Amino acid sequence: MSSTPSSRHVLRLAAGAADAVALSLSPWTAGVRVGAQQQSGKQALLTGVHRPADAPEVLRTGQRRGHDASMLPYMPGHIVVKFSPAVSPQSMSAMAADIGGRASASLHHADFVYVDIPADADPVAAAAAMARMPGVIYAEPDGRVFPTFHPNDPLYQYQWNFQKIGMERTWDINRGGKSAIIVAVIDTGVAFQDKGNFAQAPELKGVQFVSPYDFVWDDQEPVDLDGHGTHITGTIAQATNNSAGVAGMAFNVSIMPIKALYTDWDQELNAPFPYGASTVARAVRYAADNGAKVINLSLGSSLPNTATRDALEYAIGKGAFIAIAAGNDGETGSPLLYPAVYAKDLDGAVAVAAVDFALNRASYSNANDYVEIAAPGGDTQADLNDDGYGDGVVQQTLDFDAVHSGVFNQFIYYFAEGTSMATAHVSGLAALLMDQGITSPKAVERSIEMFATDVGARGRDNETGYGVINPRATIRGLGLRR
């Protein structure tokens, strides 16, 4: 762990290229709190003495990092297996034992089981051996998942992203949606509550949170140990027109905070479920079963995952529209990113590319045939609007320097870039459409694509799909006025 706390942490969170949620944290230096936290994990933080949120108006710009090619693309110690309904639990156990593994008990919101294997065993070989057995529908390594983080509000002047897509005029038609519309943010968690050593982000005060869940810890406390999920939530629903900070697109909708990404802090605190893409699959099913109308997936994995694809189909069938980040590896050949790849074959799910201040594809944004739409993702290397800051997407989130030291109640306004940020814009627009009465996921996708502003090559292209979202044109074009 040779990187310095400030540079390594800030670089990673802003970029989110293909970081596999790796913060590379150095040993904790938080004094006497270290011992208690190491002994009791997350629960010690939740039951500690509450400290009020500290949110100075600090504006900070992040930088991008490249993909960490040294990290294995899958989680060790287990594989994901779906058996035929005819296979009994006893047979599952026997088949798992044949490869030196052990089948787990059934988990909620999962149509598969985990087969635990030795930590030094090869998950690819184990999955291949399992897949050859009769009664196995699929067996796969569990792909490592990473975030693709690459009004009168006083800092609204810095939100060029909302100004570029005409949000002020859109709010003239729809003032931020309604609480009946639930947007699930499946991510690193959200700073959604004041409890113990955790604090709610001040800009999320007034946001209604429903059905929270943490699949990494198997509890109802999806606190953010990273900052990515809080930043994403801000773009979607941050308090707006409140004479404070910045704005959110659909600021009256409800947020369902779901933690599915395993971070280094979770590892340090000995989280009981260190899984990958399969956890995202469970989270998607949970969101759909609990009434989410929009699901935001600002994340990705380099490996395909059948469980996640099945979960996307399930959620769309339950009436949820899904926005998925297209990926931040555009400068290294735009390799396939999952589950974004699946979007092109699913009506009701879209893969989202990122554009910069000039509405051109951001250099890091993946260009591929699965890209369907684009939205502001930013470019922190440029300052085309001459405001003195890199052209990232600014929202309030955890202070990364504080997080590095195990402090989760300090907040800053942070300029980030990535298809993560772009995806949150599409989720916000989808929520407004749902509020206006366009409730079919397929219709939401068609509406967003139909009224997008075409940029780049004429018609659909691999860089920006059907173009950059145009919220006002989408709502007005459908005759939806209030």
What is each stretch, according to the model?
Residues 136, 152-290, 294, 384-411, ...:
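Active-site core segment of subtilase-fold serine proteases
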Residues 187, 320, 341-435:
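Extracellular S/T/G-rich loop segment that most often corresponds to the catalytic His/Ser-adjacent loop
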Residues 283-285, 290-297, 306, 318-320, ...:
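C-terminal subdomain of the subtilisin-like protease fold in secreted/lumenal serine endopeptidases
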Residues 9-21:
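Sec-dependent N-terminal signal peptides
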Residues 304-321, 338, 342, 348:
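Catalytic-core regions built around general acid/base machinery
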Residues 1-9:
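N-terminal secretory signal peptides that target proteins for export/translocation
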Residues 25-156, 171-173:
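Primarily auto-inhibitory N-terminal propeptides
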Residues 79-82, 104-106, 113-114, 138-140, ...:
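Structural recognition of the beta-strand scaffold that forms the well-ordered cores
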